[in-house]
Design a protein with these regions (language model features):
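Acidic donor-binding/catalytic loop of UDP-sugar-dependent glycosyltransferases
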Residues: 5-6, 53-70
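Catalytic donor-sugar/metal-binding loop of nucleotide-sugar-dependent glycosyltransferases
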Residues: 115, 141, 150-168
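Short acidic donor-binding/metal-coordinating loop in glycosyltransferase active sites
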Residues: 47, 55-57, 145
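A conserved acidic beta->alpha catalytic loop
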Residues: 1-8, 23-25, 58
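Short, structured coil segments at secondary-structure junctions
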Residues: 13-15, 156
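Active-site donor/metal-binding and catalytic loop motifs
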Residues: 164-179
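Short aromatic/hydrophobic "clamp" motif used to bind/position activated sugar donors
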Residues: 50
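Long helical/loop segments within the catalytic core of UDP-sugar-dependent glycosyltransferases
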Residues: 20-43, 62-142, 180, 184
Length: 185
């Protein structure tokens, strides 16, 4: 995405697999996820779940360990608790962090208690492998593909869960211009 982005070099340093986008004319996260998932599916390996994270996310050391009991209960999709890495760096970052906190802590906690479907917000969640295989990719491509996924889950009676014990840290944009670019890239 950026000349300063060291993600690929960091991945190579740790011998992680890297999937480089080919269809750069299709902008937005949903298209990037679709391309990556199709590449993974083409290798004909089966996975129990696909975890969706942004490159700048940092997982708590117990994130996966704390997500396993939720997976074992049979939930189709589950989101972890998003904490902010840089909420004190600017007003825009603070507002963004508060928005995610409101959606997750207030709304998703309440939905969990009422056994209603949660609202996914971009990153830090898993999707069961059978769904990815059924979809043959990641079919959510709107500007708010995470809300599209949330709506799909509700309309198709998929089970969702908000897991406050699976913590991850996300970096928020510092300038308003960056929030706009983040949505349309």
């Amino acid at each position: 995405e950026s000349l300063k982005d060291e993600t690929v070099n960091i991945c190579k340093k740790y011998s992680a697999s890297v999937i480089l986008r080919k269809k750069l004319n299709l902008q937005r996260k949903g298209y990037a996820l679709d391309e990556a998932v199709k590449e993974i599916l083409s290798k004909k390996q089966k996975y129990d779940a696909y975890f969706i994270f942004d490159a700048d996310n940092v997982l708590d050391k117990n994130y996966i360990k704390n997500m396993i009991p939720i997976f074992d209960k049979g939930y189709d999709l589950a989101s972890g608790y998003r904490n902010c890495k840089n909420g004190n760096k600017s007003v825009v970052a603070a507002a963004s962090a508060l928005t995610f906190s409101l959606v997750n802590t207030v709304f998703n906690n309440k939905k969990n208690k009422e056994t209603r479907n949660i609202t996914f917000s971009g990153t830090g969640f898993y999707i069961r492998g059978y769904l990815i295989e059924k979809w043959k990719g990641y079919p959510f491509h709107t500007l708010t593909e995470d809300y599209e996924l949330s709506s799909y889950a509700t309309l198709n009676n998929l089970t969702t869960y908000y897991n406050t014990k699976s913590i991850f840290y996300d970096e928020q944009p510092l300038r308003f211009k960056d929030t706009i670019n983040q949505r349309i890239r």
